[in-house]
Amino acid sequence: LAFIALPGSAQQTVKEPSTEKSFPVTVTYTSGGTEYTMTVTGLTVRKKMFFKVYGIAHYQQDPVKGKLEDVIHAILTDGKAKQITMDFARDVDAEKIKGAYQDGFKENATAEEMKTLQPLVDQFTGYFTKEVKENQQFILRWLPGGVIVASVAGEEKPVITSPLFAKVLWSIWFGEKSIVDREELVEKLTN
């Protein structure tokens, strides 16, 4: 399972108001014998035109509060474990998901970076072979060292290790051309 309740405590949740999707306040993930505990930094919704596509929660290991620019910089810097959880509010076909990620990488990387990243982008978008159904989740984890672990509808995919890939992937939600309200994704760190 993607979420583990901490021993001896009831799992607290927070709700993204637009989609009414609930997310745990903390998540724990173990990789290579290291346990990472991450705290929610904010919630928002991904909309395409007028349609709600998914509720999204972002988590970070030992997040630091501060000004928006500093918080975003810390999130886009390798070193601490981070997680994005998307809980879908509607069905979306695989080709639309692949296209959205391909566009997201092109929007957030330079042409030179894309030359290096394209094989990894192809590998990543190859993970999306089936239509996503309402209430399914995509979980993306960025572990120290530029390690990306993707879980698509409960199935963990092969790891991609590239600090540049990780930064550009996270920039889809946290970069200057964010596809969501990135301030909402860090509101627990900037208030």
Tell where the protein language model's regions lie, with residue ranges.
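Bacterial N-terminal signal peptides
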Residues: 1-5
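Sec/Tat signal peptide C-region and signal peptidase I cleavage site
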Residues: 6-10
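N-terminal structural module
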Residues: 12-77
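Soluble periplasmic/extracytoplasmic beta-strand elements of cell-envelope proteins
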Residues: 39, 57, 85-87, 149
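Mid-length scaffold segments of soluble, non-membrane domains
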Residues: 63-143
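Short strand-turn-strand beta-turns centered on an Asx-Gly dipeptide
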Residues: 151-155
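Flexible glycine-rich active-site/ligand-binding loops centered on an Asp-His dyad
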Residues: 156-182
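Cysteine/selenocysteine-centered motifs that mediate thiol-based redox chemistry or coordinate metal-sulfur cofactors
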Residues: 183-191
